Amino acid sequence: MQKKFLITTSDIFSISGQKQFEKIALKVFRFQYENNLVYKKFCDLLKTDVQKVKSLQQIPFLPIQFFKSHEVVSNTNPVQEIFISSGTTGMITSKHLVTDVALYEESFRKGFSEFYGTIEDYVVLALLPSYLEREGSSLIYMVKDLIELSNQPESGFYLHSHDELIAKLIALDQAGQNVILIGVTFALLDLIEQHQFQLQHTIILETGGLKGQRKEMIREELREKLCKGFGVSAI
């Protein structure tokens, strides 16, 4: 049975400023403490006095290791999706158990609309080879949904078809079509090494993902390289 400190979607999606965010974050903290057995035990072992937690800085944050060793859930509803973190062969991965996929979908859809507007205005192209080749990626789940919502026949995933993707980006840009290219870092770098773009109607969304694939770069160097390669002012 669910306990007190119930959180509703209206709480989460009505946040309009820092003060309100802090208020809801503290409410979420108390909800998790009351309903999430793993988190409650963690806080109790830290001897956290829940009633004295009055700011974000005082909230104990659960280490990522717990998502590898425990089932971290805050209700008893059936698990609808299990998202698994990326990792090299043999690594123990983290698991995100989702009991309400509709809430997850509403979250990223509203987030997209907040920053970019109507999804139907864009062709969504995805260059996510390392994610597309494994099971349980929340990123693939999200991008697949955005591709479908765009309702554009040109939208889609590209695995290793760089020549086809290059031609598509150039053609869509020349036609004045708004495009969002969502790509893993190393694949975006591979793409601009193959072709230097001057894109006027394309937004580049870099998802991260360089470790083990290429030499590590500082964030500023990476952004500068990608901006120059795609001919855009920001990533």
Language model features with spans:
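Short, charged/polar micro-motifs that form catalytic or ligand-binding hotspots
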Residues: 29, 94, 98, 129
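Low-complexity, intrinsically disordered/propeptide-like segments
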Residues: 49, 65, 142, 172-175
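Active-site glycine/GP-rich loop and adjacent strand/helix microenvironment
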Residues: 1-12, 16-38, 121-123, 130, ...
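Internal, well-ordered alpha/beta segment that forms a basic, Gly-enriched binding/recognition surface
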Residues: 89, 104, 108-147
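Flexible domain-boundary/linker segments
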Residues: 42-45, 49, 102, 125, ...
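Active-site diphosphate/adenylate-binding microenvironment
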Residues: 18, 34-84, 92-97, 104-120
